Amino acid sequence: MFKKLVLVQAILLFFQILLYFGCELFQRRIHDVKRPVDAKIPFFPWTVLPYCFWFPLIAVYPLVVFQTDPYSYCSYLMTMVIEIVFSVACYLIYPTSFQRPVPPDGFWGDFMKLIYHGSYRGLNCAPSLHCSSCFLIICTSFICVGMNPWIRIVTVSIAVMIVLSTLTTKQHTLIDVLTAVPLFLISRILGIMLADQYYVQFLTFIGK
C-alpha cells in the first residue's frame, strides 16, 4: 500500500514539473502582472525559508492525510491535479511575469538568487500554484476527519506563511495570489466531484 501511495505522489510530482516548466517553452507575449501596490510590499530575502517549506510540505502532507482520512486524500489528489492543469492552461493562454528585485549580498540574498535562478525564465506567475496548493492544504486540514489538532495548526500555519512569503520574496505579485483563489475554488468543487465518483476505485488500487 505504502509503495503505491508513494508512486502516486511521485507521478503527481513528475506531472507537475513536466507541465510547469514544459509550458514555458511555448509562451510568447509575456504580460507584466506587477502593479503599484506590489511596490509597497517589503522585500524580505530571509522569508525564502518559509517559501521553501512548500516543497517538503507537498511531499509529506498528503501521506499524513491519507493515513488519517483516505477520502480527504482522494479529494486532495483530484483537486491538486485539476489545479495543475488549470494553472498551466492559464500560463499558456495568458503568460505572465514581472521584474524581480536584485537580492542583497549575504546568506539570504544568495539563497534568494538561487530561487530566482531555479525559476527558469521567471514565468508562470498568475495564478500562483504555490498559493492555490496552500489554499488546498488549509481547506483539507480543516475538514480532514480525525486529523490531530496539532497537525492542523502546524500545517495551516506553514501554508499561511508560504502564501505570505510568495509576496515578500517577490516570487509573486498580489494579482498572482488573488487569482489563485478562484482557481482553488473551482478546482476544489471539481475535485470533490471526481473523488465521489472514483473513491472506491482509488482505494482498490492503493490497497487500503
Where are these regions (language model features)?
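Alpha-helical transmembrane segments of multipass membrane proteins
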Residues: 12-20, 58, 83-91, 162, ...
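Alpha-helical transmembrane segments of integral membrane proteins
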Residues: 4-12, 74-82, 151-155, 175, ...
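Hydrophobic, membrane-inserted alpha-helices
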Residues: 57-61, 132-140, 157-164
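Membrane-embedded alpha-helical segments of multi-pass membrane proteins
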Residues: 14, 53-57, 132-133, 178, ...
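Interfacial helix-loop-helix junctions of multi-pass membrane proteins
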Residues: 125-126, 161-189
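Long, highly hydrophobic alpha-helical transmembrane signal-anchor segments
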Residues: 51-71
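Membrane-interface loops
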Residues: 23-38, 66-150, 192, 196-208
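N-terminal transmembrane-helix/juxtamembrane module of multi-pass inner/ER membrane proteins
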Residues: 1-58, 103-104, 109-112, 207-208
